[in-house]
From Swiss-Prot:
Origin species: Chlamydia muridarum (strain MoPn / Nigg)
Name of the protein: tRNA pseudouridine synthase A
A biological process term (GO) from this entry: tRNA pseudouridine synthesis
Keyword Isomerase annotated: yes
Listed EC numbers: 5.4.99.12
Active site: 53 (nucleophile)
EC class (word): isomerase
Keywords: Isomerase, tRNA processing
Function summary: Formation of pseudouridine at positions 38, 39 and 40 in the anticodon stem and loop of transfer RNAs.
Subunit structure: Homodimer.
Length: 267
């Protein structure tokens, strides 16, 4: 009988080509699949909630894989310990669930939350430098917050979708777009029902133009109406972005907020 294993994963994306397998570069998916196949001696595909780009991090990526009955995959707690003992230091399994239910890490997700971290210092502190972007320009956070309001809700985000991709629809819903300031760091919190390719980084790039005074806050409304990515600002760099968490309906809602209180985290 085949069982389904669900993983919640954190990783530092600096050394990887992103989540998805690449023929000439190391990916998070390749590391996990190679390890699982060595353990099970069976070809295993690991499917994630979303494909993070090269250099992008995750605190709460969710993925699943199917495997036949195997003694090493019988207990979720042991799976977690085994994988964490064998994975490199920049990939950590935070939680494991075993289920036979109809769950899909991508299609069962109801919301995703990304965090993009900005440093207000001209040179980020050493322990932050791999996880934040410094625009090296004074930012008006109030203007950025005012601009962010225009993007909350259901809109056609074609102006924020990178070219070269085909989409059945560019309409998405943003439930929240907030800026949280803590000392010299600003976190852009973006929560929605789904995201287009590089959409979050393109939104941050547009907010930075507003913060620098290049455009008024209303410019983001104009961008929405034009539906033209060619007139948009450059994307923010990948290393400031992190997939913070993915939410699912019951019984998988423990992947949502307050995830740090999960009992599995301590095991």
């Amino acid at each position: 009988m085949t069982k389904k294993i669900i993983l919640r994963i954190a990783y530092q994306g600096t050394a990887y080509s992103g989540w998805q397998y690449q023929p000439n570069a190391l990916s998070i998916q390749e590391v996990l699949e190679t390890l699982l196949q060595k353990i099970s001696r069976t070809r295993i595909s690991v499917i994630a909630s979303g494909r993070t780009d090269a250099g992008v991090h995750a605190q709460g990526q969710v993925a699943h894989f199917c495997c036949p009955d195997h003694p090493h995959f019988s207990d979720p707690g042991q799976i977690k310990k085994m994988l964490n003992a064998l994975l490199p230091h920049d990939i950590v399994i935070r939680d494991v669930i075993a289920t036979n239910e109809d769950f899909h890490s991508r299609f069962s997700a109801i919301t995703k939350e990304y965090h993009y971290t900005l440093s207000l210092l001209p040179k980020p502190l050493p322990h932050h430098r791999l996880f934040c972007f410094s625009p090296r320009h004074k930012l008006c956070l109030e203007s950025m917050r005012e601009a962010a309001k225009y993007l909350v809700g259901t809109h056609d985000f074609a102006s924020f979708a990178n070219l070269g991709r085909e989409y059945s629809s560019t309409v998405r819903t943003l439930y929240a777009l907030d800026l949280l300031e803590q000392e010299h760091l600003v976190t852009v919190i973006c929560k929605g029902n789904g995201f287009l390719y590089k959409m979050v980084r393109n939104i941050v790039g547009a907010l930075l133009d507003i913060g620098k005074g290049k455009y008024p806050p209303e410019h983001l409304l104009e961008m929405l109406e034009k539906k033209d990515r060619k007139k948009g600002p450059p994307s923010a760099p990948p290393y400031g972005l992190s997939l913070h968490h993915v939410c699912y309906p019951s019984p998988y809602h423990w992947f949502c907020k307050h995830e740090h209180n999960s009992s599995n985290e301590e095991k």
